[in-house]
Amino acid sequence: MADLKITLIKSAAHRLPKQRAIVKSLGLGRVSSSVVKPNNEATRGAIFHIAHLVSVEEVK
């Protein structure tokens, strides 16, 4: 499986505490920050909860 590049496109401020915790646990800090994570069920589950805040693209 390829990795996923996750980019924070909207701020996590004024969001539910669970959503803020997920953003922080993924290693995203400021808007436009990006991380590369493995494409597994745990990562996809986290992305599902904050899909409206992030942009996801597949990286080989």
Curated annotation (Swiss-Prot):
Keywords: Ribonucleoprotein, Ribosomal protein. Disulfide bonds: none annotated. GO terms for biological process: translation. Part of the 50S ribosomal subunit. NCBIfam families: rpmD_bact. Belongs to the universal ribosomal protein uL30 family. This is Large ribosomal subunit protein uL30. It comes from Leuconostoc citreum (strain KM20).
